[in-house]
């Protein structure tokens, strides 16, 4: 079974509580998603490799550490995933950004892929798939399927709020994909929404339904 890490940092939990509130404005919601994504980034990016580099300070020459130049890609699931991109790019500005677009079929309730735009060397990159919600897991599974079909193998999934059902589904479909989440909530309701959750992240990010 795949690994899941719930990031319980006090700042993240505080901001997440505000994010969940029904009276949080679209502007505040957007800012909070960005801030939480950046705070989560410190943990998500913990295992990036380092290398020695010789530098000169005002005092002396010294050998210090720098990122080893590992190729990274941030891949949001459209549309809500877009809200998490800048927070991570603030930490790793050299990362490339791909996009996977999906919508839900109203009859089958299954996700349907309508857009895939990825860096040409996606198979050589460490990939962070981002989406604020991991509910049923359908979109996450389809996104990872799409990446693996194009040769990607080093994939992590980053979300703000997750449901046990979605975590289980993603872990069973892709046990090699590590999941990072700020909250593991109680369950899904009969409409497929996370409880207590935060509503529809895309609607709240963009102020449209």
Curated annotation (Swiss-Prot):
GO terms for biological process: UMP salvage; uracil salvage. Keywords: Allosteric enzyme, Glycosyltransferase, GTP-binding, Magnesium, Nucleotide-binding, Transferase. It comes from the Bacteria. Its EC number is 2.4.2.9. Binds 1 Mg(2+) ion per subunit. The magnesium is bound as Mg-PRPP. Pathway: Pyrimidine metabolism; UMP biosynthesis via salvage pathway; UMP from uracil: step 1/1. Uracil binds at residues 194, 199-201. It catalyses: UMP + diphosphate = 5-phospho-alpha-D-ribose 1-diphosphate + uracil. GO terms for molecular function: GTP binding; magnesium ion binding; uracil phosphoribosyltransferase activity. Allosterically activated by GTP. 5-phospho-alpha-D-ribose 1-diphosphate binds at residues 79, 104, 131-139, 200. Gene3D superfamilies: 3.40.50.2020. InterPro entries: PRibTrfase_dom, PRTase-like, Upp_B, UPRTase/APRTase, Ura_phspho_trans. It holds the Pfam family UPRTase. Disulfide bonds: none annotated. Its cofactor is Mg(2+). The keyword Magnesium applies. HAMAP family: Upp_B. Belongs to the UPRTase family. Catalyzes the conversion of uracil and 5-phospho-alpha-D-ribose 1-diphosphate (PRPP) to UMP and diphosphate. This is Uracil phosphoribosyltransferase. It comes from Streptococcus pneumoniae serotype 4 (strain ATCC BAA-334 / TIGR4). The gene is upp.
């Amino acid at each position: 079974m795949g690994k899941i890490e719930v990031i319980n940092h006090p700042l993240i939990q505080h901001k997440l509580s505000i994010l969940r509130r029904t009276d949080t404005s679209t502007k505040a919601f957007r800012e909070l998603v960005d801030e939480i994504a950046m705070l989560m980034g410190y943990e998500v990016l913990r295992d990036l490799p380092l290398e020695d580099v010789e530098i000169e300070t005002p005092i002396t020459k010294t050998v210090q550490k720098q990122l080893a130049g590992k190729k990274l890609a941030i891949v949001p699931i459209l549309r809500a995933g877009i809200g998490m991109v800048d927070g991570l790019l603030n930490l790793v500005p050299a990362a490339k950004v791909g996009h996977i677009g999906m919508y839900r079929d109203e009859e089958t309730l299954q996700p349907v892929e309508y857009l895939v735009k990825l860096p040409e060397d996606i198979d050589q990159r460490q990939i962070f798939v981002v989406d604020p919600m991991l509910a049923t897991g359908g979109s996450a599974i389809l996104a990872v399927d799409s990446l693996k079909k194009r040769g990607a193998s080093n994939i992590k999934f980053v979300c703000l709020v997750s449901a046990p059902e979605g975590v289980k589904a993603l872990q069973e479909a892709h046990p090699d994909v590590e999941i990072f989440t700020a909250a593991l909530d109680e369950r899904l309701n009969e409409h497929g929404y996370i409880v207590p959750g935060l509503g529809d992240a895309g609607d709240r990010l963009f102020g449209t339904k």
